[in-house]
C-alpha cells in the first residue's frame, strides 16, 4: 500500500481571494505583521500499486484529469510506502 500526497496551489500571478480574505481578517484582529497568506489544497490518496514510481505516474494522471486545473494550478506529488 502507498500513500500519495498531492499539494495543489495556485500558480504565481493567479489571484487568491481566500488567502487575501484571511490576511485581511488577521490584520483586523490585530496581526498587522501578516502581509500575505497563501492557501493550498492537500489530498491524501491511499492506494495499492506496483512500486512508488507507478503510483506517482497514476496519481499524475489523476491530477491531470480531475484533481488540478493546469491553467491555474501547480501541484506536487509525494509518495510513501505504508503498512
From Swiss-Prot:
It holds the Pfam family PurS. Belongs to the PurS family. GO terms for biological process: 'de novo' IMP biosynthetic process. The gene is purS. This is Phosphoribosylformylglycinamidine synthase subunit PurS. It is an enzyme of class 6 (ligase). Homodimer. Part of the FGAM synthase complex composed of 1 PurL, 1 PurQ and 2 PurS subunits. GO terms for molecular function: ATP binding; phosphoribosylformylglycinamidine synthase activity. It catalyses: N(2)-formyl-N(1)-(5-phospho-beta-D-ribosyl)glycinamide + L-glutamine + ATP + H2O = 2-formamido-N(1)-(5-O-phospho-beta-D-ribosyl)acetamidine + L-glutamate + ADP + phosphate + H(+). Its EC number is 6.3.5.3. Coiled coil: none annotated. GO terms for cellular component: cytoplasm. The keyword Nucleotide-binding applies. Pathway: Purine metabolism; IMP biosynthesis via de novo pathway; 5-amino-1-(5-phospho-D-ribosyl)imidazole from N(2)-formyl-N(1)-(5-phospho-D-ribosyl)glycinamide: step 1/2. It is found in: Cytoplasm. Keywords: ATP-binding, Cytoplasm, Ligase, Nucleotide-binding, Purine biosynthesis. Part of the phosphoribosylformylglycinamidine synthase complex involved in the purines biosynthetic pathway. Catalyzes the ATP-dependent conversion of formylglycinamide ribonucleotide (FGAR) and glutamine to yield formylglycinamidine ribonucleotide (FGAM) and glutamate. The FGAM synthase complex is composed of three subunits. PurQ produces an ammonia molecule by converting glutamine to glutamate. PurL transfers the ammonia molecule to FGAR to form FGAM in an ATP-dependent manner. Its main location: cytoplasm. It comes from Methanocaldococcus jannaschii (strain ATCC 43067 / DSM 2661 / JAL-1 / JCM 10045 / NBRC 100440) (Methanococcus jannaschii).
